[in-house]
């Protein structure tokens, strides 16, 4: 997935150089970083927003997104369990819901979990991962390799439909789970394994082409 992203960014930079105003050093550095190590799911999300911005001829937005990609590509994120809020995700709170809505072809309305929900969710996720580790250390390692972040979110009161879990090709490495559903570690185990399988299938879908 990372190599495919780097290849596509190379193409975007080549065909849109005048509008993107890419510095060669920034391009080379970002592509090298993306190919070399894990990157935030937000890098993938910004890539799609970059393409959407060019399609709409919003060149200022495209330039800003490119600068953000360059900056984020330098970071090597570790596996983490995060709440769906601006303190943890910043502008990705809006981006994640919007891109998930595109893929689901319906509006996904998420909100930050209540404090007590978040505490239970994090404890459940930590316990589930420990149980997987005890049963199959290689599988636990694979989860941590494929998933960058497990994000606990709640369904907004304005949402038309609920959700149990969600992941997206456009946000590779991020798994969103409903904090209201997964406060038991066995349920959490099943959810983590299911959504991790999606991450693997996203990657394999490129290999098979």
List each language-model region with its residue ranges.
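Short pre-active-site segment immediately N-terminal to the catalytic Zn-binding motif
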Residues: 176-192
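Generic preference for flexible, low-structure residues
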Residues: 148, 191-193, 208
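Auxiliary, metal-adjacent structural segments of Zn-dependent hydrolase domains
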Residues: 100-171, 181-182
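Active-site recognition of the HExxH zinc-binding catalytic motif
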Residues: 190-202
């Amino acid at each position: 997935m990372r190599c495919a992203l780097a290849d596509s960014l190379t193409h975007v930079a080549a065909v849109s150089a005048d509008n993107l105003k890419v510095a060669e050093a920034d391009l080379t550095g970002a592509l090298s970083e993306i190919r070399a190590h894990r990157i935030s799911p937000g890098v993938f999300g910004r890539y799609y927003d970059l393409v959407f911005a060019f399609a709409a001829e919003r060149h200022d937005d495209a330039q800003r997104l490119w600068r953000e990609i360059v900056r984020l590509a330098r970071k090597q994120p570790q596996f983490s369990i995060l709440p769906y809020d601006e303190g943890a995700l910043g502008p990705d709170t809006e981006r994640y819901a919007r891109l998930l809505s595109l893929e689901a072809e319906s509006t996904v309305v998420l909100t930050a979990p209540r404090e007590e929900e978040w505490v239970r969710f994090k404890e459940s996720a930590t316990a589930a991962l420990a149980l997987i580790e005890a049963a199959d250390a290689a599988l636990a390692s694979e989860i941590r390799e494929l998933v960058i972040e497990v994000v606990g979110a709640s369904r907004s009161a304005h949402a038309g439909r609920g959700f149990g879990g969600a992941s997206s090709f456009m946000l590779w490495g991020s798994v969103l789970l409903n904090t209201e559903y997964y406060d038991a570690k066995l349920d959490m185990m099943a959810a983590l394994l299911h959504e991790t399988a999606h991450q693997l299938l996203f990657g394999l879908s490129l290999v098979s082409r």
